[in-house]
UniProtKB/Swiss-Prot annotation:
Extracellular topological intervals: 1-54, 157-173
Originating organism: Schizosaccharomyces pombe (strain 972 / ATCC 24843)
Location in the cell: Membrane
Gene that produces this protein: ctr5
Protein name, per record: Copper transport protein ctr5
InterPro entries: Cop_transporter
Amino acid sequence: MSLSKMSMSGMSGMGMGSSSNSSAATCRMSMLWNWYIHDSCFLAKSWHINTGNKFAGSIIGIFFFAVAIEGLSLVQRMFDRWIVAHSNGKTLSGPLRIFFPSSTVHVTVWQQLIRAAMYSSFYLSATILMLIVMSFNGYAILFGFVGAWIGFFLFASDTYGTPSTGTGCCESR
């Protein structure tokens, strides 16, 4: 059996817990680029795709999942801007000012916990998308990347920068 067409049932000697005598449909796994639609799996055997409709739903879901990751990134930036806008000029005093400039906004423990939770959600989501793309299914890769592209287009226009005001000390003319 070639690696490019290996099924989960053919991997019974590899500790996957399935037997080669199983009559149930199996996942077609490939370590090479593939365009499998039927009997493809993403992430786990429980995400087994055995119909065209399930595959279409999965691919559309992957697309919107990638878009949502970029949306989550926007929510993170909006929360950071909200913290800065509501900081009321709170900065550190005393010996800690040596390590943290006075222009730095310092967040409360609760704000930092929320920021950490949002970052962890972003990181987990991006990792899951990476694992889905590592199925080497061309459709999953294509729709994952197109979803990220559309998501960036929709949600990242605020990251380009701000127009120059001419007040900077080191602006080039």
